[in-house]
Amino acid sequence: QKTDSGTEIPAWAGNSQDGEKTTTTVVFDESFKDFRPVSTDYWFAQYTVLKELKGIENLNTTDVTNMSHMFYHCDALPSVDLSHFNTEKVTDMNSMFSECASLTSLNLSTFDTKNVTDMNSMFNFCAGLTSLNLSNFNTAKVKDMRAMFFCCTGLTSLDLSKFNTENVTDMGVMFFYCKGITSLNL
C-alpha cells in the first residue's frame, strides 16, 4: 500500500500555469488500486483538452481529504462517473469541477459529503450541465458555498431542498448568472 503526503502535485500534472494542452485521455490501470493518495488537489487542473478518464474506478480515494480543483478547467471533458469514489474523509471540494464548460453529465450519486466544509465554486462555469442531482449531499458542515453554481448557464432546474445551510457563512453569488434556471427548490 502506497500513500502520498498530500502536499505534492503528481508528476503528470506538471507545474505550468498554462495547463496541459496535449493529453486527451487519462488511464488508471490496476496498479492504482494500491495507491492511497490523501489529496487529489489539482490533479487534472487545466487539462484543457482532456476528454476521457479510463479506469478511474481503479483510483482509490479512501484516504483523500482534499479534492479541491481536481478537475478545474477541464474544458473538453464531457462526462465523468465518480460513483465509485469514496469521499467519506473529504473536507475540501472547492472548485472541484470549476470551469468544466463541456461537462454535460456528472454522476455524484454516491458522494458522501458529511465532512465537507468547503464547496466554494464547486460547479461554477459548468455551462454544459443542464441538470445536477445533489439530493444525497449532506451539507451540515459546509461553511462556504460562495459561487457554487456561478455562471451555470445551462442549468434549468436545481433541487437543493435537502441542503442544510445552518453553518454556511458565505453564499455570495451562489446562483449568479444562472440565467437558464426555471425551477429552483430551496
Model segments located where?
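Short intrinsically disordered, low-complexity coil segments enriched in acidic
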Residues: 1-6, 182-186
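LRR flanking "cap" motifs
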Residues: 2-38, 42-45, 145
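Structural signature of tandem-repeat unit edges
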Residues: 22-35, 49-65, 75-91, 101-117, ...
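Register-specific detector for alpha-helical tandem repeat solenoids, activating on a conserved position
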Residues: 41, 68-69, 94-95, 120-121, ...
